[in-house]
Amino acid sequence: MKNKFKTQEELVNHLKTVGFVFANSEIYNGLANAWDYGPLGVLLKNNLKNLWWKEFVTKQKDVVGLDSAIILNPLVWKASGHLDNFSDPLIDCKNCKARYRADKLIESFDENIHIAENSSNEEFAKVLNDYEISCPTCKQFNWTEIRHFNLMFKTYQGVIEDAKNVVYLRPETAQGIFVNFKNVQRSMRLHLPFGIAQIGKSFRNEITPGNFIFRTREFEQMEIEFFLKEESAYDIFDKYLNQIENWLVSACGLSLNNLRKHEHPKEELSHYSKKTIDFEYNFLHGFSELYGIAYRTNYDLSVHMNLSKKDLTYFDEQTKEKYVPHVIEPSVGVERLLYAILTEATFIEKLENDDERILMDLKYDLAPYKIAVMPLVNKLKDKAEEIYGKILDLNISATFDNSGSIGKRYRRQDAIGTIYCLTIDFDSLDDQQDPSFTIRERNSMAQKRIKLSELPLYLNQKAHEDFQRQCQK
């Protein structure tokens, strides 16, 4: 019997204990809603990013990569509208001083109340008054006036802090792709349709970050801007919708029961979007946005053309047409997806004799360690370390564990998602060239004896079987 963690606090405590995440600047009492990734968190994040890149870039004939700078010319943000419009409606409770985003306050009160993203302060206030939405913290209805708060982090480039040297940490990776559209298209001799993918850090001075790593002020995005002719926009949109859903289930291990699609009604659409659908996941705090797909029309390239006075049109050599390409944008936050995967995968499993274990049921490609090498007793440590070195030479992510009883070591590895435990025993000494060992599988706890030379084939076969099982769910 498997039971999920009941609260976010329980899950976070486990992840901190075993080395996935740590509170930022913890020796100085931390920094609110900032997290550092420990050894296991780094491995898991890198595996997730590599898995995404493989699926949406490497395996695609029409998608290439880009790594644009975090700090861009401020005119980029002027053209995109971020300088003037990238803000959240901020409201405070006069009674308890709690602070909220007005739009999220309304949404949490009743998700069926739809209000446009670019609504005025007066429109937000009217909804709050009409529905008498009180403070969730103290239950009082005593609000300040709503004011808008710009989310961009401002800093200065150079030694003089004046208006001429103001720059911003990027709030999204997308604009770095748009301003490089022509560079990529020309240098790679690309013909529409094609996509440009990027994984990188973004920064937003969020009013109310929280829910662990769900919403933080520093985060990573995995995005594609797919450029195309207007007529094919909805077909490409649907293609990505299906591909993303399949990938979330088969590669990331998310259950369809914990996923749902939310299409933004017209009044909720961003100013650049003609259609947006979010995949929402059932986090421990409830259903929230996980992975978005937006049809951005030709808005972005058009506004950059207007301000820069540079030609960002595309000339179709076959039809002799010249036009500004339209864009489909699939976008996901690394940390948010990581949180969904960890929520889905981590259980407390009841075993026989009233025993229990924490089981992190991560997919093979995501697991920080595929193998833990364990000597049965300490006198076998040298042989175990020799085999451990040979496994590392096979480019297999592995760890060495010789602390505590073999049972405790099994439990420790189960709790961090390690797929297999290899136990080096006295029979392993019989063949110096091709030693054998016991291999224990994480989920079933079944054990089998194999030789070192058989290990790569065994792992590939098991990974394939795991993938097939997930696809059949």
UniProtKB/Swiss-Prot annotation:
It comes from the Bacteria. GO terms for molecular function: ATP binding; glycine-tRNA ligase activity; protein dimerization activity. GO terms for cellular component: cytoplasm. The keyword Aminoacyl-tRNA synthetase applies. It catalyses: tRNA(Gly) + glycine + ATP = glycyl-tRNA(Gly) + AMP + diphosphate. It is an enzyme of class 6 (ligase). Substrate binds at R101, E172, F219, E220, Q221, M222, E223, E329, P330, S331, V332, G333. Keywords: Aminoacyl-tRNA synthetase, ATP-binding, Cytoplasm, Ligase, Nucleotide-binding, Protein biosynthesis. Its main location: cytoplasm. Its EC number is 6.1.1.14. InterPro entries: aa-tRNA-synt_IIb (IPR002314), aa-tRNA-synth_II (IPR006195), aa-tRNA-synth_II/BPL/LPL (IPR045864), Anticodon-bd (IPR004154), Anticodon-bd_dom_sf (IPR036621), Gly-tRNA_synthase/POLG2 (IPR027031), Gly_tRNA_ligase_bac (IPR022961), GlyRS-like_core (IPR033731). Coiled coil: none annotated. ATP binds at residues 204-206, 214-219, 289-290, 333-336. GO terms for biological process: glycyl-tRNA aminoacylation. It is found in: Cytoplasm. PANTHER family: DNA POLYMERASE SUBUNIT GAMMA-2, MITOCHONDRIAL, GLYCYL-TRNA SYNTHETASE/DNA POLYMERASE SUBUNIT GAMMA-2. Belongs to the class-II aminoacyl-tRNA synthetase family. Catalyzes the attachment of glycine to tRNA(Gly). NCBIfam families: glyS_dimeric, PRK04173.1. Homodimer. This is Glycine--tRNA ligase. It comes from Ureaplasma urealyticum serovar 10 (strain ATCC 33699 / Western). The gene is glyQS.
